[in-house]
Amino acid sequence: MEKFQRLDRSHYFLYPLIFQEYIYVLAHDHGLNGSILLENAGYDNKSSLLIVKRLIIRMYQQNHLILSVNDSKQTAFLGHNKNFYSQVMSEVSSTIMEIPLSLRLISSLERKGVVKSDNLRSIHSIFSFLEDNFSHLNYVLDILIPYPAHLEILVQALRYWIKDASSLHLLRFFLHECHNWDSLITSNSKKASSFFSKRNHRLFFFLYTSYVCEYESGFLFLRNQSSHLRSTSSGALIERIYFYGKIEHLAEVFARTFQANLWFFKDSFMHYVRYQGKSILASKGTFLLMNKRKDYFFNFWKSYFYLWSYPGRISINQLSNHSLDFLGYRSSVRLKPSMVRGQMLENTFLINNAIKKFDSIVPIMPLVGSLAKSKFCNALGHPIGKAIWADLSDSDIIERFGRIYRNLSHYHSGSSKKKSLYRVKYILRLSCARTLARKHKSTVRAFLKRFGSQLLEEFFTEEEQVFSLTFPRVSSISRRLSRRRIWYLDIVCINDLANH
């Protein structure tokens, strides 16, 4: 990294780094899908360095870099086939191209004085942000992020970040060698993700991140164009004909004279959230303003990414009549009616008042679908035994089921209704009993009668344990707190049931 910083920043010569051994070590240490140099074909740690050295020597020779991944003969190269060779090169190339982006990000954070906070990485921090801001908004744009129609669009997006033409040509080589790229990225995004997870996982995430970065530049334009003048009093009036000529002067004057009456502001009521190939743009603006933003995105995609997007990719919804389904929660803004009784002298009157309140619940069907996919129940939600765990010890089986429920309960603690978690607890509890009964060749009834309530000890939620330790003498307070929505700032990923 220090060697790269000493290079001429106007050129960013990255291609020579592919011939440096330490780059392969960096790719190995920071690879998203683990080691590809050490965990292939039985090579150990010592011989992997020899593979890298021989690989670099062969690349110096003419015509050894041009090898086809789709060659049906799969000619061996250094004891490996060409798929392994291309995978190593793509991982290293993506690592090299990430260097200028990382340096630019670090310098930007240092220049702005942004303090690193691990709590901001928590998924629950998104919901606490929505809870504080979405109740004041009116409309929301639900956007499906379009996929690039051609691989050259991905390369062109990187030209603004990477100035080294040789590195971009090498990237084109890897993209062209990936068979059926166009059909993978346009027809089925899940299939594309599965393909790259097996071959070029890191390269795929790098390209997708750079593409989304260019896609989100359109939001920055909207943010800059949303500045307007707001008046809270008629005490100060500005002649419209001289408005644009007085902007610079007004910026210096309003802080001293008109601070209570006039101010410039960039639409602080426009908020943006991106997740899992989708994005949300919420605003306090009118339906006409949201429709103009929708047209802007269509024109932006068509002119910049050469995409003809169908209208269903962007929908305008009113927050009071719409629910947002993302990250395992169903969030909405509802009107909570309230009535206030007042009295003035001898007259009594009632005041009806509706308060907007952000609410989040956990839909049960996606949870049941995840449990069914992991073979804890069938499609209807009826618990079944985990046959693959029947060979484990009783304590390991109970510990695994208990850990899964504690993780799910911890993640969905922000739900205002706990019925979904009770259903999950029932499914996992009975699935655990069926698994243990299968192991001991007994029935579920006989097994539960034998062990009794001891089977439930592992299914106490982590929240209940924390509350019991925090309020050991006031059980009513702990029970009341356990029924409320709680956001944790230590959750950085969604638990995948298939990995347990």
Swiss-Prot record:
Keyword set, alphabetical order: Chloroplast, mRNA processing, Plastid, RNA-binding, tRNA processing
GO molecular function, one term: RNA binding
PANTHER family from the UniProt entry: MATURASE K
Protein name: Maturase K
Plastid in keyword set: yes
GO cellular component: chloroplast
Function of the protein: Usually encoded in the trnK tRNA gene intron. Probably assists in splicing its own and other chloroplast group II introns.
Pfam families noted in UniProt: Intron_maturas2, MatK_N
Designated gene of the protein: matK
Keyword Kinase: no
GO annotation terms (biological process): mRNA processing; RNA splicing; tRNA processing
Domain of life (superkingdom): Eukaryota
Similarity-based family: Belongs to the intron maturase 2 family. MatK subfamily.
UniProt subcellular location: Plastid, Chloroplast
